[in-house]
Amino acid sequence: MAAASTLKNMALCLTLVCLVCSAVVGAAYVVTVDPIAAAAQAKTTASIAAVLPEFSGTPEQGSVEWNGAKYNYYKADGAGYAIISSTSGFGGVLTLMVGVAEDGTIHNTTVLSHSETPGLGAKCTTDEHFMSQFRGFDPAAKTLSVKKDGGDLDAITASTITSRAYALAVSNAVAVFHELTDGGQGDE
């Protein structure tokens, strides 16, 4: 004869199922945590190399608070700063790494993460005309905003909000660069 279904039996079964599921999730975390961290570090290293002129050695890592937000940066002697800058785009947070040369010009930019609309705002990672506008851009001589707002940058077609967010992230990185080089403070 089968045991009567009681509250005690149901609670015991549910507890066992939860323990097994928790063990599986915990094991998956232990197995994947190091490869995920290594992949993130490799992406950061590749991004630093992509946004700064060629340099030797390992960049110094630091952070600085500017305008109420924390900015992580990497300083490569003789090459400039690679600064991680985030803003809100159309679909969510847009995070860039911006390479600012020692003379204050933008060497290059790259998108670290975004949640923009595929085929529209996501073109900020593939639209070569849009991305090339930032290479060699001198914020001291030009306005770092889209033409629709009186600036010198062409927006991505049908993605003005993303283009504005991208320009703002780059502009913020330039401001952080000046904070660091003009007597500001970072935790180097």
Predicted regions and their residues:
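Flexible, solvent-exposed loop/hinge segments and secondary-structure transition points
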Residues: 2-188
